[in-house]
Curated annotation (Swiss-Prot):
Protein name: UPF0260 protein Sfri_1740
Pfam families (UniProt xref): CxxCxxCC
Family: Belongs to the UPF0260 family.
NCBIfam families xrefs: PRK05170.1-4 (NF003500), PRK05170.1-5 (NF003501), PRK05170.2-5 (NF003507)
Species lineage: Bacteria, Pseudomonadati, Pseudomonadota, Gammaproteobacteria, Alteromonadales
InterPro entries, sorted: Puta_zinc/iron-chelating_dom, UCP006173
PANTHER family tied to this protein: UPF0260 PROTEIN YCGN
Organism the protein comes from: Shewanella frigidimarina (strain NCIMB 400)
Length: 148
């Protein structure tokens, strides 16, 4: 069984491999979001980055994603506090605020199937952003409703 490094290792001390393994691969960070100009309220949409594979919830061009999507955000220990748009289910966010990993997390289950089965991921729930005319028509609540 894998050592539960996330319990004993501070985020800023993790190796790049440990840091990357924290990502559950849910795909929610790849959803387009809208921030209301007047209220600063955050809204998730089901319009996903055109590089997201809707079946695997992975980026089709992950190693080179910034070439294709320059505005893609790299989540790091240095910027995690600023990324308030990450969903509460995100392992990076959870660990940053002192919570543990949820029971469905791939580091605890050994695969992504429990996450998909629990409805945590975006699997089968997104549309390609290139096919969307108005993001406002794509606002959804489910990315925020599935926290353990």
């Amino acid at each position: 069984m894998m050592t539960q490094f996330w319990i004993t290792t501070p985020l800023e001390k993790m190796t790049p491999e440990q840091w990357e393994s924290l990502c559950d691969g849910c795909g929610k960070c790849c959803l387009n979001k809208i921030i209301d100009d007047e209220t600063d309220e955050l809204y998730y949409t089901n319009a996903a980055c055109h590089l997201l594979d809707n079946d695997t919830c992975g980026c089709r061009r992950y190693p080179n994603r910034f070439t294709y999507v320059p505005e893609c955000t790299s989540i790091t220990p240095e910027n995690i506090a600023e990324l308030t748009w990450l969903p509460d289910s995100c392992a990076y966010r959870r660990l940053h605020v002192g919570k543990g990993l949820p029971s469905w997390h791939p580091l605890l289950t050994g695969n992504k199937e429990a996450m998909h089965a629990a409805g945590i991921s975006v699997q089968g729930k997104t549309v390609n952003e290139m096919k969307v005319k108005y993001l406002e028509d794509c606002i959804v609540l489910w990315p925020m409703l599935d926290v353990e």
